[in-house]
Amino acid sequence: MFGKLNHLAITSDHYTLLGMFYRAMFGLKASGDTAREIGAISVGDGYVGMTLIPRRGGRKAGLDHFGIEVEDLDKVRSKLAKKYPDIEIVKRPGNRPFASYSAHDPAGNYFDLSQPGHENRAEVYAKGEWKQETTFSHFAIRAREAERLADFYTDLFELEARNLPSEEGGYHLTDGRMTMAIVPWKISSFNGAGIEQPGMDHIGFRVPDIKAFEANRDRIAKTNIQLAPKPIPFDAEGAARLALLQKCPHGTVQLADPDGTLIDVAQDHS
């Protein structure tokens, strides 16, 4: 596969808390580089890295963007210039542990681009791959023109489309290990709940034993209330939002991190 879906990013006022949450809840590993973690913390599963970014003034909190590692960045630049001339690709500051460049899709969702061997790569992105039982499974984007975005990502990064039951008009693209779900954004989807802008929707994990995961989740919440998942269905609006999340075919248990980022979890049956 030409493109690897192996980077996620969350912006937060509590990035150090989230670092502990994802390590405790899902067994993700951090680099342990304190000098770099003053600026941001990256955690990973041996394939996907997720950078937790301190929120600056004017920047929104929450699930922020994703990234794609490519074999040949020049090939991507050439294809963008030829087929999508209105889409920009820009060089990023050298202190990013993953991103060498960033671009955007036709809907304006921005994503980072990286290539093995680039000098800026650091932390979990420079450690090489390792194996662990709990891993990322997918992330989801809500978009007005889901089909157009699916065509864009399959064309540019040679991702494989999967035929899965989903929300009507949804698409699921995979690099063989991680899946990008592109689901339609409709204002009516949020009936009974707070309306959210199009953009990134949630992240997902696969675990070896869903019952053991739930027991560990409850143990963590009792041990340290600050690491407890934020409740989703605490009222009628929350229940409506949970019902929307549950339409995703990749998960069976849903929760939110302490900041409210939605998470979908399923047992690995491979």
What are these regions (language model features)?
Residues 147-233, 238-251, 258:
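Structured core of small recognition/catalytic domains
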Residues 47-51, 60, 108-111, 177-181, ...:
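Short, charged/polar, Gly/Pro-enriched secondary-structure boundary elements
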Residues 54-59, 117-119, 184-189, 269-270:
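A short, sequence-level motif marking secondary-structure junctions
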Residues 53-55, 124-128, 188-193:
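Short beta-strand/turn micro-motifs at beta-sheet edges
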Residues 4-13, 41-44, 55-132, 164, 172, 218-270, ...:
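Vicinal oxygen chelate
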Residues 1-49, 95, 99, 140-187, ...:
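Core segments of cupin and vicinal oxygen chelate
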